Structures are given as structure tokens and as C-alpha cells.
Amino acid sequence: MSNYLFTSESVSEGHPDKVADQISDAILDAILQQDPHARVACETMCSTGLIVLSGEITTHATIDYNVIPRDTVREIGYTSSEIGFDASTCAVLTAFNKQSPDIALGVNRSKEEEMDQGAGDQGLMFGYACDETPQLMPLPIYYAHRLVEQQAKLRKSGQLSWLRPDAKSQVSVRYIDGKPKNIETVVISTQHDPDISNGDLFEGVVEEIIKPVLPAEMLSSDIRYLVNPTGRFVVGGPMGDCGLTGRKIIVDTYGGTAHHGGGAFSGKDPSKVDRSAAYAARYVAKNIVAAGLARKCEVQVAYAIGVAKPVSLMLETFGTGKVSDEKLAELITRNFDLRPRAIIHELNLLRPIYSKTAAYGHFGREEPSFTWEKTDIAEQLIADAGI
């Protein structure tokens, strides 16, 4: 189709699934702070008045599994049962095991063999980049994130004091000949105090959240703003819906523009290629687009458990490449080492950097710790491509 609408959504840090993601990554960071080589797979479930932690953790770190979830929930803004959750009074249950020794066989390596550390599981991961925004992200998901980020900023600052933590956004963009033309529909659903009128809520969201974020030149003349379409959103957070780690994988990545291998990120240490290889694939794709070798680039990489070298590598530029996809795949092999330990080393992933990733997207953000967003290989790719 040469003329179509494409839609992406995001959710706020107060959405119950994102609460779970943030708790899982806060626990991961606390462990990595003490034990960078720990094996962590932390899953979180949160419901009314309850947080349940489970998974597999092998570490010598000593952390308080009761305090970290509460601190995370408190920072998000759930401090009263009236708004759906109370960090001070919620129950926290834990049920952790250690990593299976059968899995550890393929992952653990001596110092001399560490670059041959095997993948922690089989699987396929995708990375994507395009020239629709300066951050080389698809425009719909980029602005969907910025909208809920703005909602949280205004809520925490008190500028819109009637806002509550749970919120969702959705942005529909008109594409013509493969390029974004304008934004036609914006949906914002935000939790709110019960005494705010629909009129005041609509005006506050449109004037203070939407318009300051979206570029005016991208707004269509007949743009639709759908604000709390049901008319009321007082009950939210874990009281409104049960939250689970890893249930917002499209929000976390490219908003549906690119493929997804199915593996979630949060709560997983970087020996899990679900996370580290997806970051590396973004790094590869972004450098190709930053080099001007393609307007769009999707990279797939796949692994076998216990095996260091990827079992496959695929690249697609959707007809936008300056050179053939085969040539670009050759450049990837020459310039990027996609073995798990090499990824961890190149992107410096054994650090407590993951809590920031757990809301508002893992990609397209200008955070110094997001090393997979750097474009330091672009110049070398240009030179090797010979153009």
C-alpha cells in the first residue's frame, strides 16, 4: 500500500505491566551492583495489594526483596490504596530458584574461554532503525512514548494534580509512499481523580500533554483527539488489571513496525540473548541507517543454547539500501561480533543500567547508559561500503 495509516501504542510507568517490568529490572540492577556476573531471570506479578516475585537467580549478592519492590512502586507514584496501590501496605511474596545447572553448562566459561560463552537459550531477535525521526525510530512509537512520558512529568510535578499513574497513548500516522505524512488520531487514556470534569480533563490533556509533544507540522488539519473515550478512568494500576513482567514487548521495541522474536527484556541479565542480542541488533541496524546505507533496516539474529556464534543472520532494507542487502550482511559480519560475550563487552552490559529501560521504550532514547544507541561504527561502514 502506498497510502495507509499505521498505529503504535505506549503505556506509562504506572501501567500494571510496566510496574511489573520496573520491579523486575530494579531487582536485576540491585543484584548487578554487587555481582555483575549474576544469573538473573526475575518475573513479577502485581495485583490488588499484592506483589509476587519468582524466577531463577544465582548470585552471591545480598538484597532485600521486600524493600526494592516497595521503593519502585513508591517512585512510580502508588502511595495510597485510593489510587490503586499502596507501596507501604502491599504484600510481597517471593519464590526464587537458582539457574538450572543444565543451562549453566552452556553459559559459564573460564576466563580464557569467555568470548565463547554460549547463548543462554535458543531464540531469534530483531533490531530495527529508520530515518523517520532523528533518533532513527519509527515515528508512531516514538511519539507514543513521549506522550505518556509527558503525562508522568506533569503528574509528578503537580502541574496537572488530578492525574494518576496509569495511562496509555496511541498515535495513528498517515504514510504516503512509505514516508510519514501527518498524525491523524491521538488517543490518550489517563487515570484521574474522581472530581475532575470531563471538559477540564480533555482540555488539560490536549493542551498540556499532546500539543507540547507532537510537532505542529505533523498534525493533520482534521486531527482527532480521543481522550478517555470511555468517559471515566478512576480505578487503575494493579487494582484495575493484573500486571506481569514481559507483557508489553511491542511497546518495548518498535511499536509493531518491525518483527519481534517473542522474548521479553525486563528482569533478565545480559547472558540472556533475548535482551542482549536484541540490543545488539538495534545497534547494528541503527549504525547502517546512520551511515546512510539504507533508510530502513531490520536485522534478525538467531542463536542455539550453549553456542556462541549465531546460527543465522538476516538483513532487510525494504528496497531503501544504497548497496545490496547481501553486501550489508557482509559488512555486519566484518564489523560486529554478535557472540553473546562480545555483545556484553562491546555494549558494557554488566552494569546496573536496566531500570531506566523498563518504561518508555528500550530504543530511541538519548540516555548515556543506552550504549546500543551509539553510532560509532557508521563511518567505518561507509568506508567499507565504498560509496
UniProtKB/Swiss-Prot annotation:
Coiled-coil regions listed in the entry: none
Binding site for K(+): 43
GO biological process, one term: one-carbon metabolic process
Annotated positions binding Mg(2+): 17
Keywords in alphabetical order: ATP-binding, Cytoplasm, Magnesium, Metal-binding, Nucleotide-binding, One-carbon metabolism, Potassium, Transferase
GO MF: ATP binding; magnesium ion binding; methionine adenosyltransferase activity
Positions of L-methionine binding: 56, 99, 241, 272
GO cellular component: cytoplasm
Cofactor binding annotation: Binds 2 divalent ions per subunit. Binds 1 potassium ion per subunit.
Pathway(s) annotated for this protein in UniProt: Amino-acid biosynthesis; S-adenosyl-L-methionine biosynthesis; S-adenosyl-L-methionine from L-methionine: step 1/1
Binding residues for ATP: 15, 166-168, 232-233, 241, 247-248, 264, 268
Protein's UniProt keywords contain Transferase: yes
Cell location: Cytoplasm
Documented EC number(s): 2.5.1.6
PROSITE patterns with a match to the protein in the record: ADOMET_SYNTHASE_1, ADOMET_SYNTHASE_2
Cofactor(s) required for function per UniProt: Mg(2+); K(+)
Main enzyme class: transferase
Catalytic function, reaction form: L-methionine + ATP + H2O = S-adenosyl-L-methionine + phosphate + diphosphate
Subunit annotation: Homotetramer; dimer of dimers.
PANTHER family: S-ADENOSYLMETHIONINE SYNTHETASE
Protein purpose: Catalyzes the formation of S-adenosylmethionine (AdoMet) from methionine and ATP. The overall synthetic reaction is composed of two sequential steps, AdoMet formation and the subsequent tripolyphosphate hydrolysis which occurs prior to release of AdoMet from the enzyme.
Family statement: Belongs to the AdoMet synthase family.
Xref: HAMAP family: S_AdoMet_synth1
Name listed for the protein in its UniProt record: S-adenosylmethionine synthase
Species annotation: Nitrosomonas eutropha (strain DSM 101675 / C91 / Nm57)
